[in-house]
Amino acid sequence: MLAKQFISKSLASSLRRLLPVSSTASSLKGSMMTIPKFTSIRTYTDSPEMPDFSEYQTKSTGDRSRVISYAMVGTMGALTAAGAQATVHDFLASWSASADVLAMSKAEVDLSKIPEGKNLVVKWQGKPVFIRHRTPEEIQEANSVDISTLRDPQADSDRVQKPEWLVMIGVCTHLGCVPIGEAGDYGGWFCPCHGSHYDISGRIRRGPAPLNLAIPAYTFEGSKIIIG
């Protein structure tokens, strides 16, 4: 116990020699004097006002979304209009017949090469056309028929432009077969598919066909005929 007290006193004496109390106190006093004193504390309400930048700020997200939506709708509308214009242009262009199509829509036939009492079959728009150079006897026979007895009443004069030339589409009005010329019970045309008989004016006289053979549009130009 005495030894511990002795050691404590020795250490205290050594510390006093190394750090004098007066100098340490004066140092601490000097350092305390340099600490500034706060006379007041600025609160949030005393702070200077911040500048207002609201007029320079972007609009709300809702306004921006609406602008983007309007822009997208406008762009899609413009693209749709352009596509529709191109489609209409292509559609109308397809209606403009080319020179080849116009040429195929007409058929020109030299009538001087068809002997009297004979038929000629030509192709027009993918269909056969019968051209008959009728004899005077055939013309007389065609005009002697009582049209009131016909299934499809039609005078011969209503079916020809010139009595000696009969021009018809060679398609049976029953189911579309091609009749045979100079055949049948009436000296005109006979359809072998279902037995329809046509006379020398191309009028239906017997069989299932409901109508006379059709007459195409045609014109005469000198010794030629233009079909179509």
UniProtKB/Swiss-Prot annotation:
TM helices/strands, residue ranges? 64-93
**Cystine bridges: which residues?**
C177-C193
> Where is each Rieske domain found?
139-227
The record's PROSITE patterns line, in alphabetical order, gives: RIESKE
| Cofactor requirement | [2Fe-2S] cluster
Residue stretch of the organelle transit peptide: 1-26
Q: What is its EC number?
A: 7.1.1.8
Kindly state what the record says about how the cofactor is bound: Binds 1 [2Fe-2S] cluster per subunit.
Location of the protein in the cell: Mitochondrion inner membrane
The organism sits in which domain of life?
Answer: Eukaryota
For biological process, the GO terms are: mitochondrial electron transport, ubiquinol to cytochrome c
Mention any additional remark: The Rieske protein is a high potential 2Fe-2S protein.
Q: Which family does it belong to?
A: Belongs to the Rieske iron-sulfur protein family.
> What the protein does?
Component of the ubiquinol-cytochrome c oxidoreductase, a multisubunit transmembrane complex that is part of the mitochondrial electron transport chain which drives oxidative phosphorylation.
**Protein name as it appears in the record:** Cytochrome b-c1 complex subunit Rieske, mitochondrial
